[in-house]
Curated annotation (Swiss-Prot):
Active site: 15
Listed name of the protein: Phosphocarrier protein HPr
GO biological process, one term: phosphoenolpyruvate-dependent sugar phosphotransferase system
PROSITE patterns in UniProt: PTS_HPR_DOM, PTS_HPR_HIS, PTS_HPR_SER
UniProt keywords, alphabetically: Cytoplasm, Phosphotransferase system, Sugar transport, Transport
Transmembrane segments: none
Amino acid sequence: MLQRDTTIINKLGLHARASAKLTQLAGNFVSQVKMSRNGRQVDAKSIMGVMMLAAGIGSTVTLETDGPDEQEAMDALLALIANRFGEGE
């Protein structure tokens, strides 16, 4: 199991489009992918769960991956967040 804190840096935070990109990417991996903020943990493969975190710009979230491709999943998700979900601000 891997766990890593990261900060949401895109201007609109985890809005619908960003959440969709994150859940779609998470769904490509066999590993379980969880995301948490302020004590609430959700399945990162669930768009409703991710949106319920209400993570705006500057929010710190914790990613957790567990399974055979956990490192690849973690690296890909961190890259997506660092790239501002491809929104090119």
